[in-house]
């Protein structure tokens, strides 16, 4: 079974929030998944849709698959590196601010 894959790295969203959008499209056809992400209202959905579109384009150009026959086989959201910042607080203290990043992996295949 042939499949096409797309990976987006260092996306500036928390993996926990991005996984909410990933759960919406797991196992759906590509057209349904695209609609679901477009109208989900989630930032993660908007970002994940770009990776899904890239995987579909890879399938169409490299493997000569048709968009209508594609299905989302796997969606993975992994944690990327965390940018650590600090917010100054009273009496010389500070509170940490963790700016988390994510890596998206989307795999599509024929139905």
UniProtKB/Swiss-Prot annotation:
Q: Give the GO molecular function terms.
A: rRNA binding; structural constituent of ribosome
Q: Which HAMAP family match?
A: Ribosomal_uL22_B
Q: Which Pfam families does the UniProt record give? A: Ribosomal_L22
Q: Name one GO biological process term.
A: translation
Keywords of this entry: Ribonucleoprotein, Ribosomal protein, RNA-binding, rRNA-binding
Q: Which NCBIfam families match?
A: rplV_bact
The protein's job, in short, is:
This protein binds specifically to 23S rRNA; its binding is stimulated by other ribosomal proteins, e.g. L4, L17, and L20. It is important during the early stages of 50S assembly. It makes multiple contacts with different domains of the 23S rRNA in the assembled 50S subunit and ribosome.
Domain of life, source organism? Bacteria
Q: Which family does it belong to?
A: Belongs to the universal ribosomal protein uL22 family.
Record bears the keyword Signal: no
Please report the name of this protein according to its UniProt entry: Large ribosomal subunit protein uL22
Look up keyword Plastid and say if it applies.
Answer: no
What's the subunit arrangement here?
Part of the 50S ribosomal subunit.
Cellular component annotations (GO), alphabetically ordered: cytosolic large ribosomal subunit
């Amino acid at each position: 079974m042939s499949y096409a894959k797309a990976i987006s790295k260092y996306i500036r969203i928390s993996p926990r929030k991005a996984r909410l959008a990933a759960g919406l499209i797991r196992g759906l056809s590509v057209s349904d998944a695209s609609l679901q992400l477009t109208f989900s209202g989630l930032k993660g959905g908007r970002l994940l849709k770009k990776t899904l579109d890239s995987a579909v384009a890879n399938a169409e150009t490299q493997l000569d698959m048709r968009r209508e026959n594609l299905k989302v086989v796997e969606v993975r959201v992994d944690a990327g590196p965390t940018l650590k910042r600090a917010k100054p607080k009273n009496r010389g203290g500070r509170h940490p601010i963790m700016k988390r990043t994510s890596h998206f992996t989307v795999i599509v295949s024929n139905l």
